[in-house]
């Protein structure tokens, strides 16, 4: 039986370069699946007040969920060898806060 997952579409837009320029504008959109409901995770991370502001909490939650889903799908990839031991410890710590 195939596991069901949530389907997402994420848009990333470059609004301003470090030098203050706004052109050329850049934007990309990606479709992806994730086994978690990411909006709920964002709210839980924000409620924990782990970061200076809600924007950082949102960035952390989105980055973590994108990264962790790829890591799960590619767990046998040698790139993740060192993380396979410590990442579950990190996730347990995060969930316990």
Task: Describe the role of every protein-language-model region.
Residues 2-54, 74, 78-97:
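N-terminal intrinsically disordered, cationic/polar leader segments
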Residues 56-63:
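Short, well-ordered alpha-helical segments
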């Amino acid at each position: 039986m195939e596991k069901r997952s949530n389907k997402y579409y994420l848009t990333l837009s470059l609004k301003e370069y470090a030098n203050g320029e706004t052109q050329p504008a850049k934007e990309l959109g990606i479709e992806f699946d994730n086994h978690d409901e990411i909006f709920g995770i964002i709210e839980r991370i924000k409620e924990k007040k782990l970061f200076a502001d809600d924007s950082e909490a949102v960035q952390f939650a989105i980055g973590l969920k994108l990264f962790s889903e790829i890591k799960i799908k590619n767990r046998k990839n040698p790139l993740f060898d060192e993380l396979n031991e410590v990442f579950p410890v990190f996730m347990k710590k995060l969930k316990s806060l």
